Amino acid sequence: MHMIIYLDTNVYCRPFDNQTQDRIREETDAFEVILEGIRKGRFITLTSDVLQYEITKILSPLKRTEVERYLALSKKRVEEKEEILKLGIVIRDRCGIKDRDALHLAAAIAGGATYFLTCDDGVTLATKGAGCTEKVAEEHGSGMKICNPIIFVKKEV
């Protein structure tokens, strides 16, 4: 069975960040391992309207083109519906997650993701962040887990 994962925009952009910092380099390496798993069919990636929107806002044409190429590997798209907007509001209000991040999380839950991967500490390490959002996911019939790509690779690859 294929595992469904949702990659936050910052994961797709990690290869273009300053690689002199250990954490950024490790997250980039983890992303490369995940990409290989996607190409081999082990993982199915979700995309969403909020993800597409954020990618259109990438200023560098080269970076945007490369990220769009990564995104083209996605096999499943979550259409923005009222249920996603409502769930995003619940996540924002209950868990203290920023609007766009809450919409990413809501799309991942609605799309049946097993994991939501992000490099954003505000999502993974916030006082109420991951645990709260995972509880909301559970309430909506999802066992989705939220973690950094490095942790995901250590657990699942």
Model-found features: residue ranges?
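Active-site neighborhoods of divalent-metal-dependent phosphate/nucleic-acid chemistry enzymes
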Residues: 76-127
